[in-house]
Amino acid sequence: MSDYLVAALYKFVSLPNYESLREPLIDFCQSREIKGTLLLAAEGINGTVAGTPEAIQALLEELRRQPGLDALEHKESVATEQPFYRLKIKLKKEIVTMGVEGIDPNLVVGTYVAPAEWNALISDPDVTVIDTRNDYEYEIGTFRGAVNPNTQSFRQLPQYVAENLDPNKHKKVAMFCTGGIRCEKSTALMKQMGFEEVYHLQGGILKYLEEVPEGNSLWDGECFVFDNRVSVKHGLEEGSYELCHGCRFPINETDKQSDKYIKGVACPRCYDEQTPEQRSRFLERQKQMELASRKGELHIGDRADIAKSRTTQGAPSADGE
């Protein structure tokens, strides 16, 4: 089959009847073999989906026909294999979970900065640059000079801001995330807390990697994505990272050279934390996956097993939280 089209999308907009969208969208996507995750809430829609180019374009057109979603924006990339195992369309309280009441990006948000103008902003010594993503995302790539809040989930960012940033000291703050959605809420939070000059990267890291040539880039490393590609590089090409099936954290070639790496079972991060029972279960799961692979079958049960048996706090969530 030809390459799959991957579409990352979100829109903060009032969707009072969001619950009624779920079943029709499930039917629409299943009939076109679209896979991925869509989150629906009263505050809008968020998700990443993949399928044939024709199927994804049809879905985007269908979404834009819904009241309030006519201006829905999305970012596209390509995957050589279907990057999702299944389709999930969820009803949520928030489309990206911060856990702070009263934050509405439709009312107030930071100043958008286009990728072409981002380098100049973050090169300003008076600007504090904050990576709003989680620790494991920061580890594999970030912008030069960016601060790592050391969060394990987006819910922890408000506490970091309250304890480490001061409107009287940090006059200019620039924030960025994968696709832009977390910055919508984080900059809205900052504005509510009294920070006056707050900026965020329009379209997120993905748009920057798509538009800014590598030779001019201030991005170091790769960008974690919440699908089976694991990471992408400049030009949105598939990256070099894989997921450890024991803890769901990204691993590279150096990790795989470790004595504590067991394919499909453990990596240096989680090896010492696994119980004998977990190790045995993971080994059996890997055996079944390899058998399915040799038969040309897709072993999709592993993701459910992994989700139940995470051994490390803060493992990546498919929802990007």
Curated annotation (Swiss-Prot):
Pfam family, one: Rhodanese
Xref: InterPro entries: Rhodanese-like_dom, Rhodanese-like_dom_sf, TrhO, TRHO_N
Region (Disordered): 294-321
Annotated active site: 177
Listed EC numbers: 1.14.-.-
Xref: Gene3D superfamilies: 3.30.70.100, Rhodanese-like domain
Superkingdom assignment: Bacteria
Bias-annotated ranges (Basic and acidic residues): 294-308
Span of domain Rhodanese: 123-217
Key word tRNA processing present: yes
Catalytic activity: uridine(34) in tRNA + AH2 + O2 = 5-hydroxyuridine(34) in tRNA + A + H2O
Keywords assigned: Oxidoreductase, tRNA processing
Protein's UniProt keywords contain Nucleotide-binding: no
Enzyme class: oxidoreductase
Example of a GO MF term: oxidoreductase activity, acting on paired donors, with incorporation or reduction of molecular oxygen
GO biological process, one term: tRNA modification
Classification via PANTHER family: RHODANESE-LIKE DOMAIN-CONTAINING PROTEIN 7-RELATED, THIOSULFATE SULFURTRANSFERASE/RHODANESE-LIKE DOMAIN-CONTAINING PROTEIN 2
Alphabetized NCBIfam families for the sequence: PRK00142.1-4
HAMAP family: TrhO (MF_00469)
Role according to the record: Catalyzes oxygen-dependent 5-hydroxyuridine (ho5U) modification at position 34 in tRNAs.
Similarity comment text for this entry: Belongs to the TrhO family.
UniProt name for this protein: tRNA uridine(34) hydroxylase
Organism of this sequence: Teredinibacter turnerae (strain ATCC 39867 / T7901)
